[in-house]
């Protein structure tokens, strides 16, 4: 049985495992391939290289799912938006400010997303039937906030000020991104993705009213649109940092799998697993420590979630300085509990 695609697993003894950023800079084999292409987005669009790095952690660790190597910002980039990735800085974007910018976004599509779908097809052909392939996109609020801020890590003052002061334009931009995100996910499913995930990295910065408008409502629209075409495809949502609003999210969004960050108590995860499959939530920093700590923290999660609808993952992505042998040890710990 494909453990991630069928996470309500008929085999309750097997805990599905995969990790966010499982293909990445902590792997020497990844760095070797990455060094061959200077521009990060060019690397994301290179069919052979992106396929190779997607498969690397599967070959090394035997995870239950591969997640396609791509980036959440390929979507605005596919509509002509200026994006550059600076070494040790992150993405730098043209800042979205006006109705003129919205008109530009609507009139400058390109065919770059076709490369993503080619990569999915190529990866799918190389995976066994027991390994799921996860396609993904950034959730509308997170993609929108990158465009409004013009950069990555930030304090979100610019984004929030914009949505408060420009309600109509903010809604137009949100709706545009929502529609295109749904289309992007549908095309990934058509190309062979078994599971789809929405990453909302910055959802936790919004107050409740804005969380409803910019996180819950667009996520719900995307899921419903995808399910019209692929009613049985499992969909994962990750409203990172949602805190107390996770429960509102579960109640209002028809998601199959809820990914949670490391700040969510295990008691909450157990409770929620009666309504939705829960994915998470080991602190990625634990993988920077030693085997004793890794084993202790992993076993605690496994014991608490035993018999529940649960997928083992981290609370966020694998950190670049993570020793690969620690990832292997964690995987062995989880497998030993089956």
UniProtKB/Swiss-Prot annotation:
- Where does it live in the cell? Cytoplasm
Site features described as Transition state stabilizer, chain residue numbers: 71
Which transformation does this protein catalyse, written as a reaction?
uroporphyrinogen III + 4 H(+) = coproporphyrinogen III + 4 CO2
Q: What is its EC number?
A: 4.1.1.37
List the molecular function annotations (GO) for this entry: uroporphyrinogen decarboxylase activity
Tell me the CDD domains matching this sequence.
Answer: URO-D (cd00717)
User: What PROSITE patterns does the annotation carry?
Assistant: UROD_1 (PS00906), UROD_2 (PS00907)
Which residues, by range, are in coiled-coil regions?
Answer: none
Family in the record: Belongs to the uroporphyrinogen decarboxylase family.
Subunit-structure text: Homodimer.
Q: What is this protein called?
A: Uroporphyrinogen decarboxylase
Cellular component (GO) terms are: cytosol
Q: Per its UniProt record, what InterPro entries does this chain match?
A: UROD/MetE-like_sf, Uroporphyrinogen_deCO2ase_HemE, Uroporphyrinogen_deCOase
Q: Look up the domain of life of the source.
A: Bacteria
- Is-annotated flag, keyword Nucleotide-binding? no
Report the main location listed first in the record.
cytoplasm
What is the documented function of this protein?
Answer: Catalyzes the decarboxylation of four acetate groups of uroporphyrinogen-III to yield coproporphyrinogen-III.
Q: In which pathway does it act?
A: Porphyrin-containing compound metabolism; protoporphyrin-IX biosynthesis; coproporphyrinogen-III from 5-aminolevulinate: step 4/4
The record's Gene Ontology biological-process terms are: protoporphyrinogen IX biosynthetic process
* Keyword terms of this UniProt record: Cytoplasm, Decarboxylase, Lyase, Porphyrin biosynthesis
Q: Which organism is it from?
A: Rickettsia akari (strain Hartford)
A Pfam family found in this protein is: URO-D
């Amino acid at each position: 049985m494909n453990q991630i695609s069928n996470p309500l697993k008929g085999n309750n003894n097997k805990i599905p495992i995969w990790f966010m950023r499982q293909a990445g800079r902590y792997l020497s084999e990844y760095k070797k391939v990455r060094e061959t292409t200077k521009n990060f987005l060019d690397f994301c669009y290179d069919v052979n290289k992106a396929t190779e790095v997607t498969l690397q952690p599967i070959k090394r660790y035997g995870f239950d799912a591969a997640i396609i190597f791509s980036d959440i910002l390929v979507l605005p980039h596919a509509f002509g938006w200026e994006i550059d990735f600076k070494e040790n800085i992150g993405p730098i974007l043209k800042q979205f400010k006006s109705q003129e910018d919205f008109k530009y976004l609507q009139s400058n599509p390109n065919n770059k997303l076709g490369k993503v779908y080619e990569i999915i097809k190529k990866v799918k052909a190389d995976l066994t039937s027991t390994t799921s392939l996860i396609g993904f996109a950034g959730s509308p609020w997170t993609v929108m906030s990158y465009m409004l801020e013009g950069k990555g890590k930030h304090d979100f003052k610019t984004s929030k000020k914009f949505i408060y002061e420009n309600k109509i334009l903010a809604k137009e931009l949100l709706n545009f991104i929502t529609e295109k995100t749904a289309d992007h996910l549908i095309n990934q499913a058509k190309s062979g993705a078994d599971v789809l995930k929405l990453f909302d990295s910055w959802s936790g910065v919004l107050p409740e009213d804005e969380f409803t408008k910019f996180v819950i409502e667009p996520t719900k629209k995307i899921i419903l649109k995808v399910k019209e075409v692929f009613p049985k495809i499992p969909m994962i949502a990750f409203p990172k940092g949602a805190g107390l609003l996770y429960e509102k999210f579960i109640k209002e969004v028809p998601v199959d799998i809820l990914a949670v960050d490391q700040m969510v108590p295990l008691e909450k995860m157990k409770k929620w697993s009666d309504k939705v499959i829960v994915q998470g939530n080991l602190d990625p920093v634990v993988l920077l420590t030693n085997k004793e700590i890794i084993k202790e923290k992993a076993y605690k999660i496994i014991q608490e979630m035993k018999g529940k609808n649960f997928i083992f993952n981290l609370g966020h992505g694998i950190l670049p300085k993570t020793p690969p042998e620690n990832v292997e040890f964690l995987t062995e710990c989880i497998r030993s509990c089956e």
